[in-house]
Amino acid sequence: MRVLIPLSLFAVAVSGQNSDLEGTWSSKSNQVFTGPGFYDPIEELLIEPALPGISYSFTADGYFEEAMYQVSGNPQDPKCPVAVLIFQHGTYEVKDDGQLVLTPIEVDGRQLLSQPCDDEGVSTYSRYYQAESFKSYLVQLDTYYGKQSLQLYGSDGAPLQPLFLAYKPPVMLPTITLNPTASDDAQPTSNAKRDLISHVRRSIENRHKTNAVKKTAPNIEKYWWGSLALIGVGSIAFLLS
């Protein structure tokens, strides 16, 4: 009996290592990406993308960055949706049991909350800090979309929305503390502050000069027909032998 399995069900799993996480991952909208295009730490600006979504970036040596743009409907008044933009970055660790733990730099997180029917058109800009923990994750090749995907699982084990590899190496802001405060243990000198601003500004100015390569989906249909042709040639050769 011949069993046909849809191509979309195939997924090649990749073992959980830091190098597998490396890159910038974005949700299906493909409009939200980490880096200076989402948050400008010099001007303290969160930049609204065209569509809602979420993006995570990871380096191979343990740093992460998060960009989130969410819009929630208001069932009581559909004309009053709530929108929020969130930026965080810091370090991450993959535990022995596969748990992925994100530890943000507390003073650097930012949130922009918009409630147009309650805030009189003035959004609320504030600091934001939220450590995150994922029970596990899976990096795999999703052959339906033809892209590497990152599946995160929440603390309860439930799968979250999949993310797809957009850039490798990742597009990120500098991994250092971007907005140190006077209460920090290591207070920067004036020269250090100037160096920090210069470093961040160069990152922003070079946003279009990154060596990160945008990942695009291969032509799956082309490989499908190519494989079919090879099978046909092989069958004819077998019958003639």
Swiss-Prot record:
Record flagged with keyword RNA-binding: no
Molecular function as annotated in GO: unfolded protein binding
Lumenal domain ranges by topology: 17-222
Record's function text: Required for normal levels of the cell wall 1,6-beta-glucan. Involved in a protein folding machinery chaperoning proteins acting in various physiological processes including cell wall synthesis and lysis of autophagic bodies.
Protein name (database record): Protein ROT1
GO biological process: 'de novo' protein folding; budding cell apical bud growth
Spans within the Cytoplasmic topological domain: 241
Tree of life domain: Eukaryota
Chief location category: endoplasmic reticulum
Family from the record: Belongs to the ROT1 family.
Record lineage: Eukaryota, Fungi, Dikarya, Ascomycota, Saccharomycotina
Key words of the record: Endoplasmic reticulum, Membrane, Signal, Transmembrane, Transmembrane helix
GO CC annotations, alphabetized: endoplasmic reticulum membrane
UniProt xrefs under InterPro entries: Rot1
